[in-house]
């Protein structure tokens, strides 16, 4: 493939969001392509994100193919009311021009008009294919996260039962679903819960209704809220916190389609950090846990509690679970695999 000049409508103006740097920018830098955000410049191809103005004339330029990088399940909204409100808010904020309509309809129509659509899980792919058969599943690159070979026999960790949660605050409310097993766990183990995330966030469209993360966690975790720490997300803080922890957890609210259809990225990151990880039974987590041969999926409160105790009480089991996860990474989530998938996606759109 020749070196491309790629026009990109990004998720963040700074290009620093994880969805920018771990996806298109990762591939473009590795392959030597140029990415510009001024779409009026001469480009070979345009990549659109969910924050694009889908009705912009810039996407209708002759002989310039458009690739839609759709990493979340916007085709499966929470409710018709929420879907319309999202579309209306994006119109009123100036993000999307044209007529007001539910956001999922904007996404559907843009899938139909794009030369290729990228997504991040096979579950999302099945939802997109009715609107675009040229769909490619590509997970995020995690090269920015260190691959840690952790010792579970470290004497400094013997009396410390620290548990890690990592991610964006938009998914943090899932922790209230396991407040009961965490409370019961705290009565038998001296635990501490570390949340590596943003200290503040906007509840709607990343720009409206600012919330304090620690306040939400203290409310959701009730009587064990004194066991909570919020650590600002940086690569360094994440790696350092992981070194102090014995387990990671990813509880999610499966009643919210956007959460239920999230890909396996966060589980893979926890394995990369050298931690066994317990997860809610989402389609992606269930699929990957089965493929990796780990006992990670927790169907109910009793299972969460039992699995927490097993990992904390049995370092040998925790080590084996982590090694299975890391072996899965070595076989299924390498830099060369990801780059090849990006190559094929662009080649399919440039034909």
Predicted regions and their residues:
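A charged, aromatic-enriched C-terminal amphipathic alpha-helix characteristic of glycosyltransferases
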Residues: 22, 303, 313-347
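Conserved acidic donor-binding segment of nucleotide-sugar-dependent glycosyltransferases
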Residues: 291-302, 310-316
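Active-site proximal beta-strand in glycosyltransferases
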Residues: 61-91
């Amino acid at each position: 493939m020749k070196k491309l000049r790629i026009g990109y409508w990004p998720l963040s103006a700074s290009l620093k969001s994880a969805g920018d740097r771990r996806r298109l920018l990762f591939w473009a830098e590795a392959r030597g392509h140029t990415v510009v955000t001024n779409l009026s410049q001469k480009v070979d191809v345009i990549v659109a994100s969910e924050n694009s103005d889908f009705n912009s004339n810039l996407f209708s330029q002759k002989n310039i193919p458009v690739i839609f990088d759709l990493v979340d399940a916007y085709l499966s909204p929470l409710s018709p009311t929420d879907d319309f409100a999202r579309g209306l808010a994006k119109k009123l904020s100036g993000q999307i021009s044209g007529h007001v309509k539910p956001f999922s309809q904007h996404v559907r129509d843009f899938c139909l008009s794009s030369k290729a659509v990228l997504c991040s899980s096979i579950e999302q792919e099945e939802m997109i294919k009715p609107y675009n058969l040229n769909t490619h599943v590509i997970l995020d690159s995690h090269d920015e996260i260190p691959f840690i070979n952790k010792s579970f026999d470290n004497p400094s960790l013997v009396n410390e039962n620290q548990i890690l949660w990592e991610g964006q605050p938009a998914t943090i409310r899932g922790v209230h679903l396991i407040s009961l097993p965490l409370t019961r766990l705290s009565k038998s183990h001296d635990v501490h819960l570390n949340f590596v995330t943003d200290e503040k966030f906007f509840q709607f469209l990343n720009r409206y209704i600012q919330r304090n993360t620690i306040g939400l966690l203290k409310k959701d975790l009730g009587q064990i809220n004194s066991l909570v720490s919020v650590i600002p997300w940086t690569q360094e803080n994440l790696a350092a916190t992981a070194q102090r922890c014995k387990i990671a957890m990813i509880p999610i609210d499966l009643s919210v389609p956007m959460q239920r259809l999230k890909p396996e990225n966060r589980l893979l990151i926890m394995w990369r950090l050298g931690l066994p990880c317990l997860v809610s039974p989402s389609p992606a987590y269930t699929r990957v846990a089965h493929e990796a041969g780990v006992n990670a999926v927790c169907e109910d409160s009793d299972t969460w509690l039992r699995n927490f105790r097993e990992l904390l009480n049995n370092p040998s089991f925790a080590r084996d679970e982590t090694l299975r996860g890391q072996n899965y990474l070595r076989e299924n989530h390498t830099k060369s695999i990801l780059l090849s998938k990006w190559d094929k996606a662009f080649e399919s759109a440039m034909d």
